[in-house]
Amino acid sequence: MIKDCLSDSVTLYQGDALNILATLPDAVMAAVLTDPPYSSGGVTMGARQTDPAQKYQQSGTKRQYPPMLGDAKDQRSWTMWCTLWLGECWRVARDGAPLMVFTDWRQLPALSDAVQAAGWSWRGIIAWDKRSSRPQIGKFRQQCEYVLFATKGRFVARTRTCLPGLYSYPVIAVHKVHLTSKPVALIEDLLAITAPQASVLDPFMGGGSVGEACIRTGRKYVGMELSQEYYDISRNRLTALLEAEK
């Protein structure tokens, strides 16, 4: 495990999220917002074990990204694995803390089971309209992904604003540093449910979009990443942003 404190408000870990989460004390995080590997992209084991670039990129895309780790689990093992790390997140979260986890339509039912099995109180689903997706002749486009929203116990409002349940942002290829990068503006919108300067836990840092959104909105950030390649990408990205904001 590697630990880097980039600033008083940004701490990064390189290693397995379950192992790292076990080292954190109870009830220290104000929120959890993360984008774990979906282990999706097919209904058979063979399809799930396909190269993530083939599962999640539209045909004709030329840009190559570092490989994703942990994206080939079958649904039952994925659900059990999610229950484990979600349980650790519940332990380190404060009472009333919000949980927001990205998923797709295939894994939404399994994720909702894991969230509740881990002790969280399920509060709803937020839709992210990507505005486009791979076309399927004779079928509806799968152009939405979802954010499962839950809390640790009783919901505690941190804002007087009424937040929408649908956000529409395109995926802009030139802004992506990860195969499944989420728009930073979308993350910033989701963070509106947290208090200013809240500490946000992200066990699956990927390309660092949640970290960037936290820095830009004045939140504290704790990010974890298994892949050394993506850890280096995120560390460099967030270091540059912190330097630019001095």
Predicted regions and their residues:
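Core catalytic lobe of class I
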Residues: 1-232
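Short, conserved SAM-binding/catalytic segment
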Residues: 1-7, 235-246
